[in-house]
Amino acid sequence: MSELLSLQETLYTSRNPTRRWLHRTRRARIEETLRLAAATAGSGRALEVGPGSGVYLPLLCQLFDDVVASDVEEAFLANARELAGTHPNLRPVADDITASGLPAQSFDVVLCSEVIEHIEDSEGALRAMHGLLRPGGLLVLSTPQRHSPLELAGRIAFLPGIVTFVRAVYREPILATGHINLLTAPEARRQLAGAGFDVLESGQSGVYLPLVAEFTGRIGLKLEQWIERRMIGGRLSGLLWVQYYLARA
């Protein structure tokens, strides 16, 4: 698990321009949406489901009076407890969102970023999040898109003999994603609606071009950014890496 923490911390400072851009873009989008959610739903209580390395917890603690970080992994909870030492309004708790013991209708905002792809019953998890929100509360959600080339490459990378080459190219932590439930945008919208949410805003980001990302540096990144601008909102937007939602309970 310490390897996973190391990986998550490396993503935002990666030596590889594309890897760094993909994750920083997602972080910026989530942070922007959290600020909007706090301004809309109020600055009372927030929950982050699956905080991982805790990249969003400091901002949540700035925006909200009381922040709960729930996870099932002790390493991530230990990391959150360290953060709580400097953020007294942060409370880490061991909780499984698929069988949550948190009080119903007790949060103004729930953040769930890059989590539901690890959960087989993602709609059940979304229903649980809906139940934790006060009426009119907001969910900030992100999850990878099923047909993203990056997700396909992530599976290919761990075929026998390939992962050694990939690690040699990146010279950084490379671990299997653990993504067992990738959704298309229509599927994600259906699950959100089925859980009782109304989508207020949505979007996508992130182009990954195999080999271009690994071997052409900043020149390749500029090409990926150019392609991304032309894909957003178009017929090929399902190939972008991450989908984002701001939804009301």
Question: Language-model segments: what does each one mean?
Answer:
Residues 24-43:
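Conserved alpha-helix/loop element of class I SAM-dependent methyltransferases that forms part
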Residues 43-52:
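Conserved class I S-adenosyl-L-methionine
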